[in-house]
Amino acid sequence: MKSIGLNLSGREYKILIGSDLLSETATLLREAIPCDRVVVITNIDINRIYGKKLKKHLESKGIESLFLELPEGEIHKTLDMAAHIYPQLINHFAERNTPILALGGGVIGDLSGFVAATYQRGVPLIHLPTSLLSQVDSSIGGKVAVNHGGVKNIVGSFYQPRLVIADTGCLKTLPEKEFACGMAEIIKSAAIGSSELFRMLETNTQAVKDRSPEVMEDIISQTAAIKAGIVCQDETDRGIRNILNFGHTLGHALESTSSFSQSHGAAVAIGMCFAARLSVRLGLCENETALRLEKLIADFGLPTNPKDIDPDKIIEAMHHDKKVSDGRIRFILLKRPGEALIAENILKPDVLSVLEEMK
């Protein structure tokens, strides 16, 4: 098991990464929060695979558990779904010291975190991420949010978990499409923060695709450490943390304009290719860098170009993004593998030109 610590203005928590950690949940949980009762928020598919085993494990250690099973999908990450959860917490007599365990992927983590942050002004949050994307990205850093009015993550806050338990054994049951989505975030982290990880992904593509336990634990740990290091410098996303949004400006617009039928990982993959091409157009990086990134993305079965887009609608969606400041769309652009920069004064014709090239 590997452990990564985050220290945020005196508030500390750990990200634990290893195989079969779900079977140690009770012990690891009690090391962070003394408790004898928890609420587990999950979805139908994850509950079917892990719910019964986790519930039995918790009960064997004297921890009473209420499992709340939600429908699957980004479309359900809403205020209405949060409002559906609150009465169940009240009826269960959940108190301010009753932990909420988020068992699932990014949608469950975001929604559970939003509920934990707002129920009784905040209850302990524990992430049990089961998807690759959530293990390397969404469970780390404290962003919690729901979608509203067709805009992704527009209602939310920063609310740090007390513990993250990333069981790499969960990746064995992860569908190929979901695995690829997680790889998009790993590639993103390598592109902005580690040329060594970028090269490792290029030279060990097949071992990663085969989900070699040793390789996966290594790259998950490296990716988590990159994000943790950035979050510790800028918890509330006012400065350097913005570089974690590489690929997300276009990515979120693609998700929103598709009514969230476009997966997050695929959208971010396309967004990274767009950002790299825009970087080349602006003379910020070599064309070879963009080509290497596109090849790596394609090698993991992710798309590099959008389908059936209306560039004007994409631009409009970008203006609704949280990253807009003083009416200016903020882009994260690439200089070379492992180094990115924040850019705001990008001209609309340049954006439209690259979008047209990618159609």
UniProtKB/Swiss-Prot annotation:
Binds 1 divalent metal cation per subunit. Can use either Co(2+) or Zn(2+). It comes from the Bacteria. Its main location: cytoplasm. SUPFAM superfamilies: Dehydroquinate synthase-like. Keywords: Amino-acid biosynthesis, Aromatic amino acid biosynthesis, Cobalt, Cytoplasm, Lyase, Metal-binding, NAD, Nucleotide-binding, Zinc. It is found in: Cytoplasm. The lineage of its organism: Bacteria, Bacillati, Chloroflexota, Dehalococcoidia, Dehalococcoidales. Its EC number is 4.2.3.4. Pathway: Metabolic intermediate biosynthesis; chorismate biosynthesis; chorismate from D-erythrose 4-phosphate and phosphoenolpyruvate: step 2/7. Zn(2+) binds at E185, H248, H264. This is 3-dehydroquinate synthase. GO terms for cellular component: cytoplasm. Pfam families: DHQ_synthase, DHQS_C. NAD(+) binds at residues 72-77, 106-110, 130-131, 143, 152, 170-173. One of its GO terms (molecular function) is 3-dehydroquinate synthase activity. The gene is aroB. PANTHER family: 3-DEHYDROQUINATE SYNTHASE, 3-DEHYDROQUINATE SYNTHASE, CHLOROPLASTIC. Catalyzes the conversion of 3-deoxy-D-arabino-heptulosonate 7-phosphate (DAHP) to dehydroquinate (DHQ). GO terms for biological process: amino acid biosynthetic process; aromatic amino acid family biosynthetic process; chorismate biosynthetic process. Its cofactor is Co(2+); Zn(2+); NAD(+). Belongs to the sugar phosphate cyclases superfamily. Dehydroquinate synthase family. It catalyses: 7-phospho-2-dehydro-3-deoxy-D-arabino-heptonate = 3-dehydroquinate + phosphate. InterPro entries: Dehydroquinate_synthase, DHQ_synth_AroB, DHQ_synth_fam, DHQS/DOIS_N, DHQS_C.
